[in-house]
Amino acid sequence: MSALTARFFAETGIEVRATFQPVGVLREKLVAGEPCDLLVSTHVMLEELALEGRIVADTVAMLGRVRTGIAVRSRDRAPAIDTREALGASLVAAPAIYLPDPARATAGIHFLKVLRVLALDQELAPRLHTHANGAAAMAALARSDQEGSIGCTQITEIRITSGVKLVGPLKGSLELATAYAVGLSAVARDGAHARRFAEMLAGRESAALRLQSGFEP
C-alpha cells in the first residue's frame, strides 16, 4: 500500500489517507456516514454494499484471494502446522496466541472456529491476546518476550509486519481463503481520483506487488 500511495502522490499531488480496520468495523463506519472515497474489503461485503447503494456497483474490482496464516516472531523456530494434529500440538505448546478481533475481523472469527474444531477453544482461551485488527495483533506478537508465541491473521498482515515471519497458511479443511476487492463509495468526494487509485490497486501495474504482499489470483 505505501508504495502505491507514494506513486499516486507523485502522479496526482494528492495524499491517500488510509484507515485499517476489520471488515465489520469498516462497514459500520461507512453505514454511519464516515467520509470515504474508496473501500477495500471482502468481495462479498462490497457486493452487499453495492446492492444497498453504498458502493458504485460497476466500480467493484477484484484484488485477489488472501489466505489466513500462522506467524511466529522472526527469531523463533517455525512450529509444525501441516496437519490438524500438528497445528493443535503447536497451539497447545504456545505460551500466548495473538489474533485480530474474533467478533468482527475475518481472520479472528475463523481462528475461533478452528479452535472449536480442534476442541481447544476452552483450554486456550486464557492465552488468547485479541487486538483491533490483524496488523495490531502481529505488532504485539513481534513485541512479545515469550518464546514460542504464535499469531494467526491474514497473510497480507503478517508479511507487512516487521519482527514476525509467516510459518504458512492454515491447511486442508481448516484453510480460509478470502476474496478481497475495491469499490468506489457512492458518496465519494473525489470520485475521479478515487477511481484512478482503484485502478492502481487492482490493475496490472500493481499485480507483482499484490502477489508479493500475499494476494493470490
Segments (PLM) and residue ranges:
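Exported/periplasmic ABC-transporter solute-binding proteins
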Residues: 1-19, 24, 28-35, 43-52, ...
